[in-house]
Amino acid sequence: MKTGLLLPAWSYAVEGATLSACALLAFADRAVDAGFASLWVSDHFLNEPYVDYAAMDIQFPDEYRGIKSGQWECWSLMAALAARTTDVTLGTLVTNTAFRNPALLARIIDTVDDISGGRLVVGLGAGDFATEHHAFGYDFERPIARFEEALSIIRPLLRGETLTHQGEFYRTQGASLLPKSVRADGPPIMIGLLRGGPRMLRLVAQYADQWNCMLPFADSHVASYIAAWQQVSAACEKHGRDPATLARNVTVGVCLNDNYPLPGALPLRGSHQQLIDACLAYHEQGVETLSMVVEPCTEASLEVLAPVLEAL
């Protein structure tokens, strides 16, 4: 089982401090040195945790009222990481298809995959927070319908097809990705989903090469994953896909202090051996990649986790 780290690219992410983009890239180097086999970047512009997370049934305390958080732009970081690293897998966890025209996004993805030498996993999602969509002028109505149409454009373009599309939200006319990246079929597509409805489950079965189970906001122990996988597996069978063809990627919260920032969540905690055992429980369930949201996300924490990563 491979391990990964979600890089702390957002405001106040490192014990209340915000890393510059250059400092974040240097931190990525330290993560690779510690033994992480993959690096991940989320895709947000701006959110107001007290308001936005409430829509996800996560209630921050009153002192968070009015506080806003942003993030360095995802694909700028991905391009820099692709040029800076040599061996590790790079992925988005996940990129919001509503933020960029899907044909343009496919062109960006293909370019970054080529820069990386074919090490990219492209995680795609429909978007989470109304605040950032409205702030930056994007519609947030009918996000699943938009997401499905975006997938119907991104996937064939990444696979090398020429595409003419006249849809409800997007249009292309003879679009193709030229020149094409080092992988003729493009990078694997991963769709992130924990508690999706029937439509999102169908999209995982129909479009995804990998599925990500995002647990840092919930219970990061393996029982949560098992319940979610049962839903995804059943959806694959319902829509005529062998579940064994869907690679599995899980993101967990790992807390090395008493200050995990997400209210109500249950991250992995404990000694080195307790963390190793909790992670290996995922390997026993067939998970290929276990990525982590680490608190505090510091160089000292990377040193603490190095023996855990070596054991996995």
What is each residue range found by the language model?
Residues M1-L312:
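Active-site-adjacent structural elements that line small-molecule/cofactor binding pockets in enzymes
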